[in-house]
């Protein structure tokens, strides 16, 4: 039994597995892609690319809690990789967990200071945190709020039309 388990772990990831899963996913058969991903992960638990793709698929399906589990496990198994932290942050942000998103992005950028997507996402998270702070400042405000209102309007415009 131990020998079989050792051989299973030593088996290389088949490129076909990843390609098949990606093809199913792109064709819109996400449920079948997830089943194939689970099978491949069961056979090769450290298959980072397939685990990452599974997290992306779960995120796209708005199954945020499951996506967070997948990306968190990847950050634990491969703490040097920036992409799992970046994608974890995206899911946290979508879930409204901005402080967790900020922490994940900071870790991604410690791992790769030039990671473009993490830098962009960090800006988005900072902007969302600013909107939260400015909105809270308006609650119960009795003073001149024109400058604060302008900031909020501009920030929301950027959030609505980022590109």
What are these regions (language model features)?
Residues 127-163:
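Terminal, low-structured helical/coil segments at or just beyond the last alpha-helical repeat
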Residues 43, 77-78, 111, 140-143:
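Structural marker of alpha-solenoid helical repeat scaffolds
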